[in-house]
């Protein structure tokens, strides 16, 4: 069976790692002929990842000279090229609802959301995504194939060692600081608000956007084996993401004997249980998160309880070979099933496009109204009388004269006179 996975690039990331692992299992254990198709020109070298040597990597023009049983988009932008690749069936491997990666007024948000309406079958990695896709596209085939774990790299410790209170709590923060939804700086700030002794390590593949942070160590990018070793040296992984798919890093940490403090982000309920193997904190609660970390620093019995149960949770999680078998079954089912209903997909696409355009028009109207208000205020502030008022406003007699106005409309006065 011939399968093409369309990818934007082969740079180090969790999403690409999942695609590569599935492709590898299909080739090694299920007799598939798999190609990783790069849909755009590459400026940077590929991720130095050994399994890539066993996979066929093609450019889009090269892939268009072939014919596949199933062509699979793996990111919303790869759907732009999906139907250029000759295939009997088309599928979309959805690792998150990717419109959520963008701010509300970003054009990419609408584009990413519309790709869900394409006439494709869906494969996804988390229960919440599968349920959402089935609600949005009841006409489309949708199957769930959870991510596996490389049990050789993220090996489960035979025994979880007790971490004594004499040592500081070892906290690990991981994520791309340029991704607003990862909230890496919020996590660092929460650790900084701790009262108990602690040691903070920050891991990021790209340090652009990180800046100067209060951390004992900043490392990265790390290979999977290096990341596994770091998890093993840590007590707790702190993740304050607001958008996730299957939420893989805490599961990797569980395998290495670390627990997690996290928000109730999508994907957490696949394996996280508050008070059993991790702690779930509130959104945007720096001090509450710091208190949860302080609790683990003080109560080493609770810390050990969570870490031991995290390791037990990890023991029950499947490896990549098991999940590769499910991916093979999903792709065979897509190949054998009837193609999706193009009319139903077109109906959903045009309906969502119409709603998206109305929403975008509303945003633009609000922006134009705010711009007009800002222009009016700017003209008032630059009026010669206002310029003169700013020069004398801090004098005692001026403050006495403007006291009633400052009491009645302090915000208006600040906007007019400026800081």
Regions found by a protein language model. Name each.
Residues 118-134, 138-156:
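Donor nucleotide-sugar binding/catalytic pocket of nucleotide-sugar-dependent glycosyltransferases
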Residues 229-234:
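Short alpha-helical donor nucleotide-sugar binding micro-motif in glycosyltransferases
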Residues 242-243:
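Aromatic "clamp/platform" in nucleotide-sugar-dependent glycosyltransferases that forms part
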Residues 274-275, 279-285, 295-300:
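Conserved acidic donor-binding segment of nucleotide-sugar-dependent glycosyltransferases
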Residues 301-358:
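A charged, aromatic-enriched C-terminal amphipathic alpha-helix characteristic of glycosyltransferases
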């Amino acid at each position: 069976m011939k399968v093409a996975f369309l990818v934007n690039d082969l740079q180090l990331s969790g999403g690409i790692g999942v695609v590569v692992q599935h492709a590898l299992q299909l080739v090694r254990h299920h007799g598939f002929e798999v190609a990783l198709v790069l849909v755009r020109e590459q400026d940077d070298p590929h991720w130095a990842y050994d399994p890539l040597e066993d996979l066929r990597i093609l450019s889009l023009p090269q892939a268009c000279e072939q014919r596949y049983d199933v062509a699979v988009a793996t990111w919303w932008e790869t759907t732009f090229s999906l139907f250029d690749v000759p295939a009997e069936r088309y599928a979309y491997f959805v690792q998150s609802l990717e419109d959520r990666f963008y701010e509300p007024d970003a054009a990419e948000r609408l584009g990413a959301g519309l790709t869900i309406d394409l006439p494709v079958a869906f494969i996804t990695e988390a229960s919440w995504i599968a349920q959402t896709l089935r609600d949005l596209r009841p006409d489309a085939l949708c199957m769930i194939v959870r991510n596996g774990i490389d049990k050789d790299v993220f090996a489960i410790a035979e025994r979880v060692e007790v971490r004594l209170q004499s040592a500081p709590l070892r906290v690990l923060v991981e994520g791309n600081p340029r991704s607003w939804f990862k909230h890496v700086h919020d996590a660092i700030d929460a650790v900084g608000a701790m009262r108990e002794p602690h040691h903070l390590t920050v891991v990021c593949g790209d340090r652009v956007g990180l800046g100067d942070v209060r951390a004992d160590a900043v490392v990265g990018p790390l290979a999977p084996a290096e990341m596994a070793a770091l998890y093993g040296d840590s007590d707790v992984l702190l993740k304050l993401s607001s958008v996730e798919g299957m939420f893989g890093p805490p599961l990797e940490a569980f395998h290495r004997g670390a627990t997690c403090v996290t928000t109730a982000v999508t994907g957490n309920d696949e394996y996280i249980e508050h008070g059993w193997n991790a702690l779930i904190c509130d959104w945007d609660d720096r001090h509450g998160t710091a208190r949860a970390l302080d609790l683990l620093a003080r109560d080493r019995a609770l810390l050990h309880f969570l870490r031991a149960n995290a390791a037990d949770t990890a023991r029950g999680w499947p490896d990549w070979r098991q999940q590769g078998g499910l991916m093979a079954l999903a792709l065979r089912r897509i190949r054998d099933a009837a193609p999706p209903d193009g009319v139903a997909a077109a109906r959903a696409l045009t309906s969502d496009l119409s709603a998206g355009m109305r929403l975008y028009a509303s945003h633009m109207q609000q922006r134009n109204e705010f711009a007009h208000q800002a222009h009016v205020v700017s003209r008032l502030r630059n009026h010669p009388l206002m310029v003169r008022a700013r020069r004398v406003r801090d004098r005692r007699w001026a403050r006495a004269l403007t006291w009633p106005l400052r009491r009645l409309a302090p915000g208006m006065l600040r906007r007019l006179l400026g800081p």
